[in-house]
């Protein structure tokens, strides 16, 4: 009894309550409070471990030194055996071995991490103040970006294939991953639960909200503890890249290119969707990546909105992500006069609001009232980045002194030559030159506040004065941490609005930064051919004609107008000098009409070569051309109407077409009896002889032709109800 011993009696009766809390802490609950101590104390005992009875058959009672490895006495309250810690040593040295073949496969992410670190290079350590801001980052390099639910199904399928519960793997990525894992993990002896944990690392993106200064891709985040402290940073170059970072990077580039291209087309939204659906990134459909990838970037979010996916509720202005943290406002249209007396119609936000602003190189906290900046606290990597943030905040505040600081007219246009909206007009104006804005803003005396200093109109720091309401802080402003996604709508011009009608994103917000994608981006849409310049347009146009020759051929003879209006010929028009587009088009269309009228002069090579020139609205003129000019390689190059040129070269011997020296595909042409180079085949393996000839019976459908013998003639119905007489060729051959 504790009360009978004087010392314990004293503790239990006289201890103050706060000490009682400590006693309680160490004596209550099932959670071990001091694991290290507990471990030392346990290991000091003779038999600290219990094991299943089968251990007695697998391990001798004594080791080579004669020390006892297990005791016959049962563990109190169970039928397990008491085992010495020496038994573990014996097992490690003499126990059964197992195949290690599956370890690198199951622990793939760890093995890969070791390789990346082995080949990584660590540079010097710099001591300086680190402006870290919390960002949502990917902490798991080398994952496949499946959703948690999708991954769970794959894991169950691989690890417990015979379990009950129907799981249907639907998405392409699920099936690919499942097949690969099942092949790699045949006869695997590693505990299923371990395999499941490791598979999860391979399949799912794990994000954490961490303080970061510097690189945010997952191969940097995995060494965050080695590369940045509170007052130091260690330079580091990863020893390898991982696909998930490459996907994120390439997705942003593809999305930016697509949004930029869509903006200038007649129907931006329809074009954007067409391009998203026909683009592949690293061999995976872009729309599949968009559905799974949580990357938040303006262009990516516009593409997601177009697909009807939810996106973050923050909005973008001047390349900064704004998140309202308190307050509210109503919008009213107001007319204001610039310093140049130009009238602008702006939507004024009336009311007090607070925002966080997060950009790539600077962050800020902004407090504003109606057309008035109350306070702006900025932090950034350098003077330039801080200035960018200040300009954006000043424009966003809609203050009168900002509008009055405009010198000259505002007439900025977007890629499609449409005027920008007034807020973006102002932004572009001051991004070009903000001197007057800063000069007119006004300055004030400042109090000495820890961690804050002033900034003067010339962007130099000061401890006495500062731009009115503006301060520079040593501390960064954290990115908005919530992963909440909202339903949005998108209009024809790619403006994305939330359900209250606030504009969250527009093409003006898409960065003009050009980068080189890490993964191959394949834009199948003809709208993207011009992304790699005029040469690519030329090659792609001709490749497209050759790939689709079967249908092009029939349209050429049946419904040329529809063929001439194909969007695939649109990019090509930019290569033809403006002044002659209409003349060329009229000339080639007339030439083609003559070919159709005079049966038997169907020249495949010539049709392919001249077809792209028919897309412009034709001008009727008597002009004849022996060559047509296209602007490539910085100058006009000629395509000969009859014959080869460096631009368009058809080699009869190899039957291959080269465009500007690049292979554009094979033309398996078949110049028939006698008329070399003259083609009159519209149907593969048949020669068109002329108009319908009743002597050869009723018109057959194209499918019925297969029964004809070589050299036999028949009438056949093609295209829009026209009937022509054809003959089955005497040699087996095909045109293309």
From Swiss-Prot:
Disulfide-bond pairs as recorded: none
UniProt xrefs under Pfam families: Flu_PB2_1st (PF20947), Flu_PB2_2nd (PF20948), Flu_PB2_3rd (PF20949), Flu_PB2_4th (PF20950), Flu_PB2_5th (PF00604), Flu_PB2_6th (PF20951), Flu_PB2_7th (PF20952)
Subcellular location: Virion; Host nucleus; Host mitochondrion
Gene Ontology molecular function, alphabetical: RNA binding
Keywords: Cap snatching, Eukaryotic host gene expression shutoff by virus, Eukaryotic host transcription shutoff by virus, Host gene expression shutoff by virus, Host mitochondrion, Host nucleus, Host-virus interaction, Inhibition of host innate immune response by virus, Inhibition of host MAVS by virus, Inhibition of host RLR pathway by virus, Inhibition of host RNA polymerase II by virus, mRNA capping, mRNA processing, Viral immunoevasion, Viral transcription, Virion
CC per GO annotation: host cell mitochondrion; host cell nucleus; virion component
Gene3D superfamilies (UniProt xref): Polymerase Basic Protein 2, C-terminal domain (3.30.30.90)
A single GO BP: DNA-templated transcription
Residues spanned by motif Nuclear localization signal: 728-731
SUPFAM superfamilies per the UniProt record, alphabetical: PB2 C-terminal domain-like
Function: Plays an essential role in transcription initiation and cap-stealing mechanism, in which cellular capped pre-mRNAs are used to generate primers for viral transcription. Binds the cap of the target pre-RNA which is subsequently cleaved after 10-13 nucleotides by PA. Plays a role in the initiation of the viral genome replication and modulates the activity of the ribonucleoprotein (RNP) complex. In addition, participates in the inhibition of type I interferon induction through interaction with the host mitochondrial antiviral signaling protein MAVS.
Similarity comment text for this entry: Belongs to the influenza viruses PB2 family.
Subunit structure: Influenza RNA polymerase is composed of three subunits: PB1, PB2 and PA. Interacts (via N-terminus) with PB1 (via C-terminus). Interacts with nucleoprotein NP (via N-terminus). Interacts (via N-terminus) with host MAVS (via N-terminus); this interaction inhibits host innate immune response.
Protein name as catalogued: Polymerase basic protein 2
Organism ancestry: Viruses, Riboviria, Orthornavirae, Negarnaviricota, Polyploviricotina
Gene: PB2
């Amino acid at each position: 009894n504790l009360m009978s011993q004087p010392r314990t009696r004293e503790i239990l009766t006289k201890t103050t309550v706060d000490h009682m809390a400590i006693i309680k802490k160490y004596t209550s609950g099932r959670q071990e409070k001091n694991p290290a101590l507990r471990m030392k104390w346990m290991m000091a005992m003779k038999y600290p471990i219990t094991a299943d009875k089968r251990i007695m058959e697998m391990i001798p009672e004594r080791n080579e030194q004669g020390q006892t490895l297990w005791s016959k006495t049962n563990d109190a309250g169970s039928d397990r055996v008491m085992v010495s810690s020496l038994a573990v040593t014996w097992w490690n040295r003499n126990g059964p071995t197992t195949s290690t073949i599956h370890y690198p496969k199951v622990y793939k992410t760890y093995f890969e991490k070791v390789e990346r670190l082995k080949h990584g290079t660590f540079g010097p350590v710099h001591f300086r103040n680190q402006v870290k801001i919390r960002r949502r980052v990917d902490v798991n390099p080398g994952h496949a970006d499946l959703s948690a639910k999708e991954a769970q199904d794959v894991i169950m399928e691989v690890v417990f294939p015979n379990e009950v519960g129907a799981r249907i793997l639907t998405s392409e990525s699920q099936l690919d991953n499942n097949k690969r894992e099942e092949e790699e993990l045949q006869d695997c002896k590693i505990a299923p639960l371990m395999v499941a944990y490791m598979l999860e690392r391979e399949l799912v993106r794990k994000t954490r909200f961490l303080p970061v200064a510097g690189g945010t891709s997952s191969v940097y985040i995995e060494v965050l503890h080695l590369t940045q402290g509170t007052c130091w940073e260690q330079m580091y170059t990863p020893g390898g890249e991982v696909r998930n970072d490459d996907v994120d990077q390439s997705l942003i580039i593809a999305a930016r290119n697509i949004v930029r291209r869509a903006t200038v087309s007649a129907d931006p939204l329809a074009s954007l969707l067409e391009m998203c659906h026909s683009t592949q990134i690293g061999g995976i459909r872009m729309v599949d990546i968009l559905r799974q990838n949580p990357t938040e970037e303006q262009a990516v979010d516009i593409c997601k909105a177009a697909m009807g996916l939810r996106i973050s509720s923050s909005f973008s202005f001047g390349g900064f992500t704004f998140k309202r943290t308190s307050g509210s406002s109503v919008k009213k249209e107001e007319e204001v006069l610039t310093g140049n007396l130009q009238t602008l119609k702006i939507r004024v936000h009336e009311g007090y609001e607070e925002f966080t602003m997060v950009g790539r190189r600077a962050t800020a906290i902004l407090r504003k009232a109606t057309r008035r900046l109350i306070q702006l606290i900025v932090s950034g990597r350098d003077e330039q980045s801080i200035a960018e943030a200040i300009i954006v905040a000043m424009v966003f505040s809609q203050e009168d002194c900002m509008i009055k600081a405009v010198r000259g007219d505002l007439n900025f246009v977007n890629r499609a030559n449409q005027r920008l909206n007034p807020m973006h007009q102002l932004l572009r104006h001051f991004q070009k030159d903000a001197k007057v804005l800063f000069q007119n803003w006004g300055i004030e005396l400042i109090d000495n506040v820890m961690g804050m200093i002033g900034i003067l109109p010339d962007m130099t720091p000061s401890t006495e004065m500062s731009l009115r309401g503006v301060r520079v802080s040593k501390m960064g402003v954290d990115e908005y941490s919530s992963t909440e996604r909202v339903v949005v709508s998108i209009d024809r011009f790619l403006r994305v609005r939330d359900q209250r009608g606030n504009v969250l994103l527009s093409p003006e917000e898409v960065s003009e930064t050009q980068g080189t994608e890490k993964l191959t981006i394949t834009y199948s849409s003809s709208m993207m051919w011009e992304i790699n310049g005029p040469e690519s347009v030329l090659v792609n146009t001709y490749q497209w004609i050759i790939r689709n020759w079967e249908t092009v051929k029939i349209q050429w003879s049946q419904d040329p107008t529809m063929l001439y209006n194909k969007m695939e010929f649109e990019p090509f028009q930019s290569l033809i000098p403006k002044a002659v587009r209409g003349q060329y088009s009229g000339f080639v269309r007339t030439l083609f009409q003559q070919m159709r009228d005079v049966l038997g002069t169907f020249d495949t090579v010539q049709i392919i070569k001249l077809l792209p020139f028919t897309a412009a609205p034709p001008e009727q003129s008597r002009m004849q051309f022996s060559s047509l000019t296209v602007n490539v390689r910085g100058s006009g190059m000629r395509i000969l109407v009859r014959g080869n040129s460096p631009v368009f070269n058809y080699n009869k011997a190899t039957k291959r077409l080269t465009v500007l020296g690049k292979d554009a595909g094979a033309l398996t042409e078949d110049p028939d009896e006698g008329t070399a180079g003259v083609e009159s085949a519209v149907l593969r393996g048949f020669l068109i002889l002329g108009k319908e000839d009743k002597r050869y019976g009723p018109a057959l459908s194209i499918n019925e032709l297969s029964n004809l013998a070589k050299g036999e003639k028949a009438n056949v119905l093609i295209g829009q109800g026209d009937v022509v007489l054809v003959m089955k060729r005497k040699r087996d051959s095909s045109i293309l």
